[in-house]
C-alpha cells in the first residue's frame, strides 16, 4: 500500500495525470472527451458503447470484428422470448438495488414509487396506466444500462410480468397467481385465458430467463449476428468519464472544491442530471456505480 504520509502526493499525481490527458490535443482540438452525439440522452449512452467511429470517449478498449473475432454478450443476455438458441439468455440479472441507484431527474432518491404513501406499509398501491410508467423520469442512463418492464429491444417490447393479481370476493383482497412460462404445457401459464407470467419472465424455473424482472441493456447489439452469438461491440477498458471521476475524487481528497464541482458535474450534465453544488465522496462513488455498471469496475453493482 501507500503510506498515509504520502497520500496527498499520490492524489496529486493522479490529478496531474488526468489533467494532462484532458489537455491532449491534435491541431488545437482535444483528442478525448465525453461522447455527445445524440440529443436523445438514453440513445446517446447506448451508442457510446456501440459506435466505434468518431468516438472521443474511448481511450483504451478491446476491439472485436466480424472476421472470426467476436464474443457472445448479446446472445448470453438476450431476453427469453428473443433467444436464437435454447441455452442462452439472461445470464446477468440486474437487481432492484441497481435500478433504484439511478436517480429520478427531479428527485435524487431513485427508489421506485409503489404506494400512495411510501411511509405507510398498508397504504394503497399506485396504479400506473402503463407498465413502464413507474420508471418515468429516471436518469436516462438507466434505460441504456438495464431493460425493465416496458423496454424495447430489437423493435420488440419486452413482456415482463411476474403474475396476476386476482380479486377474491370472499376475502376482499387480491391474491397473486404465478404461472410458469417455461412449462411445456402452455395452459399452466393461463388463468381464464389470460397469460399469467410474461413471455420474458421473471421465473425461477429456467436458468436462461430473468429471475429479477430485469435484463442487461449495456453492450447489447440489435443485429441478427449478435443475437446469434457473434457480437462485435468493443469492451472499454478506460474511457473519458473515468478520467473525469478519477480527477474529481483526487481533487476532493486534496480539498480542491472548484475542480471537484467541474469534473464531477461534467459526467452528470452529459447524462441530463442537475449539477450538485458540493459533491461529497459518497456522491462520487454513487456516480461511478451508475456510470460504469457492467464495465468490470465494481465487484458489487
Please tell me what each predicted stretch does.
Residues 1-89, 109, 113-301:
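Acidic/polar-rich alpha-helix caps and helix-coil junctions
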Amino acid at each position: 500500500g501507500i503510506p498515509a504520509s504520502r497520500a496527498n502526493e499520490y492524489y496529486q499525481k493522479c490529478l496531474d495525470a488526468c489533467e494532462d490527458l484532458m489537455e491532449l490535443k491534435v491541431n488545437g482540438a482535444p483528442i478525448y472527451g465525453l461522447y455527445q452525439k445524440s440529443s436523445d440522452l438514453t440513445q446517446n449512452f447506448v451508442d457510446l458503447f456501440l459506435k466505434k467511429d468518431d468516438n472521443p470517449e474511448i481511450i483504451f478498449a478491446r476491439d472485436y470484428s466480424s472476421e472470426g473475432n467476436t464474443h457472445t454478450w448479446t446472445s448470453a443476455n438476450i431476453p427469453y422470448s428473443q433467444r436464437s438458441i435454447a441455452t442462452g439468455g439472461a445470464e446477468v440479472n440486474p437487481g432492484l438495488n441497481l435500478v433504484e441507484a439511478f436517480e429520478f431527474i427531479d428527485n435524487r432518491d431513485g427508489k421506485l414509487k409503489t404506494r400512495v404513501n411510501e411511509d405507510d406499509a398498508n397504504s394503497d398501491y399506485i396504479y400506473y396506466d402503463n407498465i413502464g410508467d413507474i420508471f418515468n423520469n429516471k436518469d436516462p442512463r438507466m434505460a441504456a444500462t438495464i431493460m425493465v418492464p416496458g423496454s424495447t429491444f430489437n423493435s420488440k417490447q419486452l413482456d415482463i410480468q411476474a403474475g396476476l393479481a386476482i380479486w377474491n370476493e370472499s376475502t376482499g383482497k387480491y391474491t397473486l397467481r404465478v404461472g410458469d412460462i417455461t412449462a411445456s404445457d402452455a395452459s399452466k401459464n393461463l388463468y381464464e385465458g389470460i397469460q399469467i407470467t410474461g413471455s420474458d419472465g421473471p421465473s425461477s424455473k429456467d436458468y436462461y430467463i430473468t429471475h429479477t424482472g430485469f435484463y442487461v441493456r449495456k453492450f447489447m447489439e440489435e443485429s441478427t449476428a449478435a443475437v446469434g452469438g457473434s457480437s462485435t461491440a468493443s469492451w472499454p477498458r478506460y474511457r473519458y468519464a473515468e478520467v473525469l471521476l478519477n480527477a474529481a475524487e483526487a481533487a476532493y481528497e486534496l480539498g480542491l472544491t472548484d475542480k471537484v464541482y467541474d469534473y464531477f458535474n461534467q459526467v452528470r450534465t452529459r447524462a441530463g442530471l442537475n449539477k450538485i453544488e458540493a459533491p461529497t465522496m459518497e456522491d462520487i462513488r454513487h456516480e461511478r456505480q451508475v456510470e460504469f455498471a457492467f464495465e468490470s469496475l465494481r465487484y458489487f453493482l
